[in-house]
Amino acid sequence: MAADAAAGSAVARPQIRVEGVAKSYSGRTVVDVDELVLGDSPIEGLIGPNGAGKTTLMRMIVHAVPLDRGRITLQSPAEPDLLLSAMPTDRIARHGVVKSNQLITDFDRLTILDSLLFAVTEAEREKPYRIFSERAVFARHREEIERLLDYFGLVDATAFAKSAGEKKLLDIIRCLILKPRFLLLDEPTAGLPDDITEKVMHTLRELAAAGTTVVIVAHDLNVIWNLCDEVVFMAEGKALLRGDPQSIREHRTIVEKYLGEGHV
């Protein structure tokens, strides 16, 4: 892709470079990407039909799914060619590459506050089994935690997240608190009310403006069109087209074959 030609040069904002990456299950190829750079723009979207490989590719980036072949690297001024595909998931997170649902928490047993505390504690863990002072960790993050809980309407931090929407929102808040360099979000606004969706989008714009690269997968194309600077269209495991939202919306073949007229 033309947008990928800048790979290998110094970049001002973190990028993920995917090269010759493939994944198959039971003989069926679900991801087959020759070359793709994510992060040419502050906020990018991955779209495509069900089974296109979008979520699997995201999970491969954080090594939640092992690669059959290929390499995935983080490109940034501090670490120009960091091989993510050779790292365990927790180490990738310590390098600032964070994906939603990356930390598994039992929402039914932890309060909203405890689950956030768990997230920041795990993120600051320098090596497995190191013992942390949870009070010290919380003290460093308390103001930001309280601000985000208030902003998104989760005012009772001692309550338990019950609905799917509350759990999704809590996961987004955890990602924001971690201040990632590169943030991967899978369906971040699915099931959320319109007012909260707007707040999520506003917060992601602020995060991107501060230097974080954001990549989202979403079937709600209104979110894609209104939030993303660039969009990558995937189908049958391949990255087929890249462009700004307007050019993707006007690509008639893709609209007619995959997205439907109602999404134009």
Put a short name on every predicted segment:
Residues 183-186:
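Catalytic Walker B motif of ABC-type/P-loop ATPase nucleotide-binding domains
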Residues 224-226:
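A short, surface-exposed alpha-helical micro-motif characterized by mixed small hydrophobic
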Residues 62:
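Helix-to-loop junction immediately C-terminal to a conserved catalytic motif
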Residues 16, 30-33:
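Conserved structural motif at the start of ABC-family nucleotide-binding domains
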Residues 47-49:
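The feature captures the beta-strand-to-loop junction immediately N-terminal to the Walker
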Residues 218-219:
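H-loop/switch region of ABC-family ATPase nucleotide-binding domains
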Residues 71-93, 132-134:
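ABC ATPase NBD Q-loop/coupling interface
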